[in-house]
């Protein structure tokens, strides 16, 4: 595991400079927010080392995600109205500290809003999501969230499988998912540890 970005992040924090670049005031040691940001930094390093593409928009989305979650929490779930209203505000507040190029605003908000759609997995929605231009970034983001939240619901594994299988396999996965949900679908978003 390559950790150059994480080491730089930790050095900036130890020198007291990080708070001037990104607001980490209410992060406690070993909190979801810090684990998620660390996972994103390590992921970025691993992608660079493997000569895979990286975009600053993805990393900015990851660094700001804990702040968006904090602004959107409501009784153990996300308040969707707060979630969508907070997106622009979070980016605007970050711009007071560091520049976030306008071309990344839409990219960041797409990744964030796709997190809700990736969690829903109803009807024809998964097929539409697969064709979204930001699907791959949103999927990678979901895997990082799942890792940082220490979640074992298998949502990331489900999406991994859904990408691999052919059309009949996709239909079967959706059928199994539908059968596993008894009664009406509860619209609760976010991983438990992410929301605590």
Ranges and model annotations:
Residues 3-174:
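Conserved, hydrophobic alpha-helical core segments of structured domains
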Residues 177-196:
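Arginine-glycine-rich low-complexity intrinsically disordered regions
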